[in-house]
Amino acid sequence: MKFIDEVKIQISAGDGGNGVASFRREKFIPRGGPDGGDGGHGGSIYALADHNLNTLIDYRFTPVFRAKRGENGRGSDCYGKGAEDIVLRMPVGTIITNDLTGELVADLEHDQQKVLLAKGGRGGLGNLHFKSSTNRAPRQFTHGEAGEQFELRLELRVLADVGLLGLPNAGKSTLIRAVSAARPKVADYPFTTLYPNLGVVRVDAGHSFVMADIPGLIEGAAEGAGLGHRFLKHLGRTRLLLHVIDVAPFDENVDIVHSARALVDELRKFDETLYRKPRWLVFNKVDMLPEDEQQAVCTRLLQAMNWQERWFAISALTGRGCQALIYAIMGHLQQLQSDSEET
């Protein structure tokens, strides 16, 4: 199924039904009192988070939703029937904003989270409500209220604990295949990954975390070059970023340090908050280097980048170093959780 992560929709809740002016008409009761019933309420529109969904593609083809109006009231004190509500199922991680004002309407963070998007109009009042000691035969009634109408923007941001950053062909997809059950496409050409992939990394029977792989970034991504800029927003909810670097590129003219710095610059240009997230370096494809040069290459890169944070040397293809990496990630996430509980 095609991955669609941003759409616009129009929603219109139903109007309330009208009240009615009616009088009791029975044999031997020539002057029956008012018995006009109220109108039914219009249908409301809700959003419901569903963890079984992972794309907004359905809303690309059906962008307009209108709930029905409530029935009008009737005589004999009969109330009009309320209209049924509409429930729009959306993936967990969907952010809903008012497209005209930019106001946040809802952030669907949990499965089965239900949020009112547009409230149906209340039904009008029948003339029974207007009876008084001075007005025994009122003819007043009220019309139903209009339902709310909005133009909304739906934006899906995947929910993951760890996000993978890197240039095209850095080996991010191979890494997520190596440590999880996810099976993204892997090939020896740029932009094999065309949309985010999620993988659940099971460390042991009781511990796991979610890893997200987005399309590779290239220089100028913040201005729209390549594919990755569109998907950087999906890393906004992560708690840790892994900057995956290919230490053995096929093109020997590639300046690894320059490329790594360029990616970090793109991150900073796109979102300062994302740039400030905890970030580790992961040197991938070390198995492609002569064994006696592997440590020296990593050390040279660390010095050139003036890197003081955590780093790992792995081979996503052979699995070398991957176990130590995922245990370190799990420990980091547990520490973050512990710190948040203390505060």
Swiss-Prot record:
Residues noted as binding Mg(2+) in the record, renumbered to the chain: S173, T193
Gene Ontology cellular component terms for the protein in this record: cytoplasm
InterPro entries for this protein: G_OBG, GTP-bd, GTP-bd_Obg/CgtA, GTP1-OBG_CS, GTP1_OBG_dom, GTP1_OBG_dom_sf, OBG_GTPase, P-loop_NTPase
Cofactor(s) essential for the protein: Mg(2+)
Residues that, per the record, bind GTP: 166-173, 191-195, 213-216, 284-287, 315-317
Keyword Hydrolase attributed: yes
CDD domains with a match to the protein in the record: Obg (cd01898)
Protein keywords: Cytoplasm, GTP-binding, Hydrolase, Magnesium, Metal-binding, Nucleotide-binding
GO molecular function: GTP binding; GTPase activity; magnesium ion binding
Ranges of residues in domain Obg: 1-159
SUPFAM superfamilies with a match to the protein in the record: Obg GTP-binding protein N-terminal domain, P-loop containing nucleoside triphosphate hydrolases
GO biological process: ribosome biogenesis
EC number assigned by the record: 3.6.5.-
Presence of keyword Magnesium: yes
Function (record text): An essential GTPase which binds GTP, GDP and possibly (p)ppGpp with moderate affinity, with high nucleotide exchange rates and a fairly low GTP hydrolysis rate. Plays a role in control of the cell cycle, stress response, ribosome biogenesis and in those bacteria that undergo differentiation, in morphogenesis control.
Protein name listed in UniProt: GTPase Obg
